[in-house]
From Swiss-Prot:
Subcellular location: Secreted
Cellular component GO terms, alphabetical: extracellular region
More about this protein: Negative results: has no effect on rat Kv1.2/KCNA2, Kv1.4/KCNA4 and Kv1.5/KCNA5 channels.
Disulfide bonds: 8-27
Source superkingdom: Eukaryota
Stated name of the protein: Potassium channel toxin alpha-KTx 3.15
Stored InterPro entries: Scorpion_toxin-like_sf
Similarity-based family: Belongs to the short scorpion toxin superfamily. Potassium channel inhibitor family. Alpha-KTx 03 subfamily.
Organism per entry: Mesobuthus gibbosus (Mediterranean checkered scorpion)
Function: May play a role in blocking voltage-gated potassium channels Kv1.1/KCNA1, Kv1.3/KCNA3 and Kv1.6/KCNA6.
Presence of keyword Ubl conjugation: no
UniProt key word Kinase: no
Tissue distribution of the protein: Expressed by the venom gland.
Keywords, alphabetical: Disulfide bond, Ion channel impairing toxin, Potassium channel impairing toxin, Secreted, Toxin, Voltage-gated potassium channel impairing toxin
Length: 29
């Protein structure tokens, strides 16, 4: 399986997506 990616707006792709990036895989703007 591939790591999950969390779609986020550039304004919201800060702490929530940083945590998701460490825990689940990645965050894409």
């Amino acid at each position: 399986g591939s790591p999950l990616t969390y779609p986020c707006h550039s304004a919201q792709c800060e702490q929530p997506c940083k945590d998701a990036n460490m825990r689940f895989g990645x965050c894409m703007n």
